[in-house]
């Protein structure tokens, strides 16, 4: 405390000894020095601030450069790999956002293995692959039909029905993919029920089953050996496919009632190869001969001539291949598998002519037996009569079954397994009642004599105004 008082008294004494002018000059010089000190401090602070800002600017510039490099790198990676849609995650937030915004469009879907992607999803533009387009055969007087392909009128008519043709093509593409899938796994030792259900499950997925708008056109036929057509297993059928069997796979798909009816024959023993070749050749001959204004009987005659030109040797015996004369091809209508006209596979049929815009199933059956089939075995195929009117029904169970048929199948064919699948039970008496009333028609298996072998090939053709399209044609047959 004493030291502070002495300094204060010394200061006051010194001030008291100065003149007033000297005091003013001292005060002015002190103020100038203080101002200079403040200026120096400000300069230092400005210099320090400037020194801090310059590194910040350099850091910002380096971040921007890194960002630009990352963006360039991301663009190069996208160009190299169009399928890569996600960012690496190493860049900053802004770069990540840009990558998300600039995602590449997804490429077209591809079919899975086993097939499960609907055909309509594989072709999102709604335009489906065409079948084999052929020029119509020349007329009897030698005139060609080449003019149809260039006629503006015929082109306009063809275009007017493009939506219809497109429905057939979608159903045909489903058929092609299903049968390709079937050939990859069908083998001896499988039960017929297993084969049919596996096929039908795949067909339902690819056709994108939707009530009466899209689905299966008729039950899967898998007729064996002497049985030529209309066999599919009922519940409880334990039949197993054998190495020496000859199996006709006949199944159909439809879009909006536009039916694809197409069949092929499966064998494992090469001894049947010539029989299959004969029937396939006969079917292709029928397709080649078919056309606008062609008589149905002329098609049948050409088919018979080709088929009977083949001989086959099976187990040491030689057979002439015979066309099954009471089985035919047929015209196809909307939701109607047999639309009224028949295409014979022997000579002497109807002289009715094929017409522009019609659709036909050209199918041939060859046999080593008598060449005639008869009803045999337990019935599995049924179809509502297309022309039946209102028929009064008394029994409630029968009424219920008819409602189920109308809602799920309409006038398309069905089988007992499909009724089981819908949860129906104890329906056999009701089904018999519907058959007795003529509302539903039964289609039992059709067989040649025991010990004979039968084969089948079939395609659906469109008689378009400009050309003939074998819409179900594939790489397989």
Curated annotation (Swiss-Prot):
Binds 2 divalent metal cations per subunit. Has a high-affinity and a low affinity metal-binding site. The true nature of the physiological cofactor is under debate. The enzyme is active with cobalt, zinc, manganese or divalent iron ions. Most likely, methionine aminopeptidases function as mononuclear Fe(2+)-metalloproteases under physiological conditions, and the catalytically relevant metal-binding site has been assigned to the histidine-containing high-affinity site. Residues 1-121 are annotated as: Disordered. The modification Phosphoserine is found at residues 45, 62. Keywords: Acetylation, Aminopeptidase, Cytoplasm, Glycoprotein, Hydrolase, Metal-binding, Phosphoprotein, Protease. The modification N-acetylalanine is found at residue 2. This is Methionine aminopeptidase 2. Residues 36-46, 96-108 have a biased composition (Basic residues). It comes from Bos taurus (Bovine). Belongs to the peptidase M24A family. Methionine aminopeptidase eukaryotic type 2 subfamily.
């Amino acid at each position: 405390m004493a030291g502070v008082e002495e300094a204060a008294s010394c200061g006051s004494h010194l001030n008291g000894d100065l003149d007033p002018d000297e005091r003013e000059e001292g005060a002015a010089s002190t103020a100038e020095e203080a101002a200079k000190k403040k200026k120096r401090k400000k300069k230092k602070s400005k210099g320090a601030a400037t020194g801090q800002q310059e590194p910040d600017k350099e850091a910002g510039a380096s971040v921007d450069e890194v960002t630009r490099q990352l963006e360039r790198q991301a663009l190069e990676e996208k160009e190299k790999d169009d399928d890569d849609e996600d960012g690496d995650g190493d860049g900053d937030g802004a770069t990540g956002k840009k990558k998300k915004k600039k995602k590449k469009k997804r490429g077209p879907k591809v079919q899975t293995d086993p097939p499960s992607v609907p055909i309509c999803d594989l072709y999102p533009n709604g335009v489906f692959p065409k079948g084999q387009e052929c020029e119509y055969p020349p007329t009897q007087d030698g005139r060609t039909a080449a003019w149809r392909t260039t006629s503006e009128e015929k082109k306009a008519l063809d275009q007017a029905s493009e939506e219809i043709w497109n429905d057939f093509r979608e159903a045909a593409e489903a058929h092609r993919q299903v049968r390709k899938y079937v050939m990859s796994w069908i083998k001896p030792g499988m039960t017929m029920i297993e084969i049919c259900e596996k096929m039908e499950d795949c067909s339902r997925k690819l056709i994108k089953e939707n009530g009466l708008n899209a689905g299966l056109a008729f039950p899967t036929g898998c007729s064996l050996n002497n049985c030529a057509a209309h066999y599919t297993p009922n519940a409880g059928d334990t039949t197993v496919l054998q190495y020496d069997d000859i199996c006709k796979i006949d199944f159909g798909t439809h879009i909006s009632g536009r039916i694809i009816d197409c069949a092929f024959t499966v064998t494992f023993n090469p001894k049947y190869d010539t029989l299959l070749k004969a029937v396939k050749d006969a079917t292709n001959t029928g397709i080649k001969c078919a056309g606008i204004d062609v008589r149905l009987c002329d098609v049948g005659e050409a088919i018979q001539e080709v088929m009977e030109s083949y001989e086959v040797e099976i187990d040491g015996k030689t057979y002439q291949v015979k066309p099954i004369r009471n089985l035919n091809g047929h015209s196809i209508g909307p939701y109607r598998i047999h639309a009224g006209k028949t295409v014979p596979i022997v000579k002497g049929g109807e002289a009715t002519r094929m017409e522009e815009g019609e659709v036909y199933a050209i199918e041939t059956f060859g046999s080593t037996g008598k060449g005639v089939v008869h009803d045999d075995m337990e019935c599995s195929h049924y179809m509502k009569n297309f022309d039946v009117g209102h028929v009064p029904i008394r029994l409630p169970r029968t009424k219920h079954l008819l409602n189920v048929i109308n809602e799920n199948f309409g006038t398309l064919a069905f089988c007992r397994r499909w009724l089981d699948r819908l949860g129906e039970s104890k329906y056999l008496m009701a089904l018999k009642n519907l058959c007795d009333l003529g509302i539903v028609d039964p289609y039992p298996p059709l067989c040649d004599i025991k010990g004979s072998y039968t084969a089948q090939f079939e395609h659906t053709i469109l008689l378009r105004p400009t050309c003939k399209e074998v819409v179900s044609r594939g790489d397989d047959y």
